[in-house]
From Swiss-Prot:
Residues 1-34 form a transit peptide. It is found in: Mitochondrion inner membrane. It is a peripheral membrane protein. The keyword Ribosomal protein does not apply. The modification Phosphoserine is found at S105. It comes from the Eukaryota. The keyword Disulfide bond does not apply. InterPro entries: NDUFV3 (IPR026193). This is NADH dehydrogenase [ubiquinone] flavoprotein 3, mitochondrial. Residues 33-72 are annotated as: Disordered. Belongs to the complex I NDUFV3 subunit family. One of its GO terms (biological process) is mitochondrial ATP synthesis coupled electron transport. Complex I is composed of 45 different subunits. This is a component of the flavoprotein-sulfur (FP) fragment of the enzyme.
């Protein structure tokens, strides 16, 4: 039923309806959190008070030793002022020619 109402109202009406419902859910969420904090269920009976053991934490994984001498990407440190130009020249032979429209380009 709600979906058919939203479809009839259009975008603005649907947005307005969603905002109103969001306010209702916010109010409901605060009520639920208060009832959960009180320690009683909805019927007024105390909740099951059995002691639960805290969740066990997994054993910490030992960290791997950090070793800079085994770095494999050596070209990463091989930059110079002309690195980009060298690569540009190297890759230019693989570039495809740009298509032409058939007319001359404008002179600037």
């Amino acid at each position: 039923m709600a979906a058919s109402c939203l479809l009839r109202q259009g975008r603005a009406g649907a947005l307005k309806t969603m905002l109103q419902e969001a306010q209702v859910f916010r109010g409901l969420a605060s009520t639920v959190s208060l009832s959960a904090e009180s320690g009683k269920s909805e019927k007024g009976q105390p909740q099951n008070s059995k002691k639960q053991s805290p969740p066990k934490k997994p054993a910490p994984v030992p960290a791997e030793p950090f070793d800079n001498s085994t770095y494999k990407n050596l070209q990463h440190h091989d930059y110079s002022t002309y690195t980009f130009l060298d690569l540009n020249l190297e890759l230019s032979k693989f570039r495809m020619p740009q298509p032409s429209s058939g007319r001359e380009s404008p002179r600037h």
